[in-house]
């Protein structure tokens, strides 16, 4: 899962 709270 990719954390969308991070810019990258």
Swiss-Prot record:
Chief place of localization: secreted
Annotated cofactor note: Binds 2 calcium ions per subunit. Binds 1 heme b (iron(II)-protoporphyrin IX) group per subunit.
Keyword terms of this UniProt record: Calcium, Heme, Hydrogen peroxide, Iron, Metal-binding, Oxidoreductase, Peroxidase, Secreted
The protein's enzyme class: oxidoreductase
Gene Ontology cellular component list: extracellular region
Example GO biological process: hydrogen peroxide catabolic process
Signal peptide (UniProt feature, chain positions): none
Gene Ontology MF term list: lactoperoxidase activity; metal ion binding
UniProt subcellular location: Secreted
Cofactor: Ca(2+); heme b
Catalytic activity from the UniProt record: 2 a phenolic donor + H2O2 = 2 a phenolic radical donor + 2 H2O
Metal-binding in keyword set: yes
Listed EC numbers: 1.11.1.7
Role: Removal of H(2)O(2), oxidation of toxic reductants, biosynthesis and degradation of lignin, suberization, auxin catabolism, response to environmental stresses such as wounding, pathogen attack and oxidative stress. These functions might be dependent on each isozyme/isoform in each plant tissue.
UniProt similarity note: Belongs to the peroxidase family. Classical plant (class III) peroxidase subfamily.
Protein name: Peroxidase 4
Originating species: Betula pendula (European white birch)
């Amino acid at each position: 899962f990719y954390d969308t709270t991070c810019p990258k």
